[in-house]
Amino acid sequence: MTSQKLSLQDIILTLQQYWANQGANLMQAYDNEVGAGTQSPYTFLRANGPEPWHAAYVQPSRRPADGRYGDNPNRLFQHHQFQVVMKPSPDNIQELYLGSLEALGIKPLEHDIRFVEDNWENPSMGAAGIGWEVWLDGMEVTQFTYFQQVGGIEVDSVTAEVTYGLERLASYIQDVPTVYDLDWGNGVLYGDIFKEPEYEHSKYAFEASDQAMLLRHFDDFEKEATRLLDLGLVHPAYDYILKSSHTFNLLDASGSVSVTERAGYLHRIRTMARRVSKVFIDERAKLGFPLLKDDDLREIYLGEHGKYTLTEEN
């Protein structure tokens, strides 16, 4: 708890201003269903290849299996993450993070802030890295990750990802008993906005979804993603990979897939994720990696014997 009880809206605005001052470009939430801010193309795709990338954005994240009809004080079908990606990772990224807490009125020297080792992996997306959970006075509020692999490809430049759980952070700052009691802003409560959708999405995920339709959709989305990748259309293909992932999560939440089938679906998603990462790098290389300004790095990656130098065989 802090002496200044910022609304959730004020927390977002403060984090946006803070990270913009650190050089992050403020992006908008991606307009597709994702399970975490990591799945946004502003993180997943941009972590591939050698180009620098600094961004921050709020991302609504849907996890059908976590829905609880609005009855659980802090477990949600949809929650909100504030995502920061810094590539290459600044040497002082942890200090920058602590500075963001101070901007929110949380003075590090007055609180028990612990970095608890928690190496991260998302098998379905072929992504992994070393990381830490950040605990604030006993509550996990942030996940830190240094990406080592994305889409099954070892990264060229380490991306630091800082993911704030906005509901958890706001619950700590405002000291409220449930997420639905949070002050979103201007006297409007979190529950006024999200409790009814939370109930309805939970009912859909667990009771009302059309399983046969979802199974057909998964196959269709996979076929379309594959077709688009054959055409080199990375971003439309990635949209269909995200749709495949969300459709699988709905099937999984309702218990419609067996343990064996589950492994098969995850493998299919992982195969698409690995391919889109490779095609993304290839397409950026064809453009000459326009965000890569450093001459020495350009020589390493695009010089005569560079890692991504195009040849007739390419």
UniProtKB/Swiss-Prot annotation:
<keyword id="KW-0436">Ligase</keyword>
<dbReference type="GO" id="GO:0005829">
    <property type="term" value="C:cytosol"/>
</dbReference>
<dbReference type="InterPro" id="IPR006194">
    <property type="entry name" value="Gly-tRNA-synth_heterodimer"/>
</dbReference>
<dbReference type="GO" id="GO:0140096">
    <property type="term" value="F:catalytic activity, acting on a protein"/>
</dbReference>
<dbReference type="GO" id="GO:0016740">
    <property type="term" value="F:transferase activity"/>
</dbReference>
<dbReference type="GO" id="GO:0006426">
    <property type="term" value="P:glycyl-tRNA aminoacylation"/>
</dbReference>
<keyword id="KW-0963">Cytoplasm</keyword>
<dbReference type="InterPro" id="IPR045864">
    <property type="entry name" value="aa-tRNA-synth_II/BPL/LPL"/>
</dbReference>
<dbReference type="GO" id="GO:0004820">
    <property type="term" value="F:glycine-tRNA ligase activity"/>
</dbReference>
<comment type="subunit">
    <text>Tetramer of two alpha and two beta subunits.</text>
</comment>
<keyword id="KW-0547">Nucleotide-binding</keyword>
<keyword id="KW-0648">Protein biosynthesis</keyword>
<dbReference type="InterPro" id="IPR002310">
    <property type="entry name" value="Gly-tRNA_ligase_asu"/>
</dbReference>
<dbReference type="Pfam" id="PF02091">
    <property type="entry name" value="tRNA-synt_2e"/>
</dbReference>
<keyword id="KW-0067">ATP-binding</keyword>
<comment type="similarity">
    <text>Belongs to the class-II aminoacyl-tRNA synthetase family.</text>
</comment>
<protein>
    <recommendedName>
        <fullName>Glycine--tRNA ligase alpha subunit</fullName>
        <ecNumber>6.1.1.14</ecNumber>
    </recommendedName>
</protein>
<dbReference type="GO" id="GO:0005524">
    <property type="term" value="F:ATP binding"/>
</dbReference>
<keyword id="KW-0030">Aminoacyl-tRNA synthetase</keyword>
